[in-house]
């Protein structure tokens, strides 16, 4: 067993704290868990310091800038120390300001439809995203992005094979009505449809409080499960009720 507790880092790349544990029952299998909290670090430096984050949160590669990141994760490993994705559980919160959304085929197509003015440099004033990973799927809770002439809410799911199912609610735009965009597929091949604005009331004061409560509860369930494994209080992670659409249904009630 290898265990690190409250390992701290201070550098020109940022600062952070890490606790982690690795255990192996035999040469064929093992398990690991970590609790990470980093402040004011460049996204590319975060990925280079902790390559596993790129596996857990592939959407990070779409952003450039400085972020704060809090993450807890646990998983089982095979004999080559590769993550067994079905066993992966993770909770992550990202906060950043003056972020740049990197150009990609998906964004290029959407920006054409929405007539973004600044297509070469897509600056986001601020971003605060909460995500959980469970059952080979990452759920991104709805969050607000303000960019160019638009205010949009984004949420959805992304599989570990990089396929995704996202919804974008356009809350403010030059168009005099609200609309939604469903995007499904992979970065190489995807489809999008104009739909109803699913999140139009989700960020009203009353619904925002309920959404925050749901996010906190789901994150806490994942976090407690990870800490439980790290503290070796149980050999099996506790059962966690899937968040999925049920979380949004709770907010909508």
PLM features per residue range, with description:
Residues 133-161:
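Extended serine/threonine-enriched, polar tracts that run as long, contiguous segments within proteins
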Residues 1-10, 14-126, 133, 155-253:
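Membrane-proximal interfacial segments on either side of biological membranes
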């Amino acid at each position: 067993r290898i265990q690190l507790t409250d390992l701290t880092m201070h550098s020109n790349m940022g600062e952070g704290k890490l606790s982690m544990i690795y255990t192996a029952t035999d040469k064929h299998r093992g398990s690991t868990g970590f609790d990470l909290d980093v402040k004011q670090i460049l996204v590319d430096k975060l990925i280079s310091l902790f390559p596993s984050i790129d596996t857990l949160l592939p959407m990070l590669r779409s952003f450039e800038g400085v972020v704060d990141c809090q993450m807890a994760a646990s998983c089982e490993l095979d004999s080559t120390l590769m993550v067994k994705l079905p066993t992966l559980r993770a909770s992550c919160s990202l906060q950043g300001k003056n972020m740049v959304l990197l150009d990609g085929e998906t964004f290029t197509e959407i920006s054409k439809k929405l007539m973004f003015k600044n297509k070469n440099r897509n600056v986001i004033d601020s971003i605060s995203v909460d995500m959980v990973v469970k059952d080979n799927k990452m759920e991104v809770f709805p969050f607000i992005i303000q960019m160019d002439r638009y205010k949009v809410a984004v949420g959805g799911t992304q599989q570990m094979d990089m396929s995704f199912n996202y919804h974008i609610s356009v809350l403010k735009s030059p168009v005099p009505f609200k609309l939604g965009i469903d995007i499904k597929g992979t970065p190489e091949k995807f489809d999008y449809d104009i739909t109803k604005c699913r999140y139009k009331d989700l960020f009203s004061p009353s619904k925002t409080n309920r959404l925050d409560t749901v996010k906190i509860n789901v994150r806490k369930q994942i976090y407690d499960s990870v800490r439980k494994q790290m503290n070796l209080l149980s050999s099996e992670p506790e059962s966690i009720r899937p968040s999925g659409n049920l979380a949004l249904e709770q907010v909508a009630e």
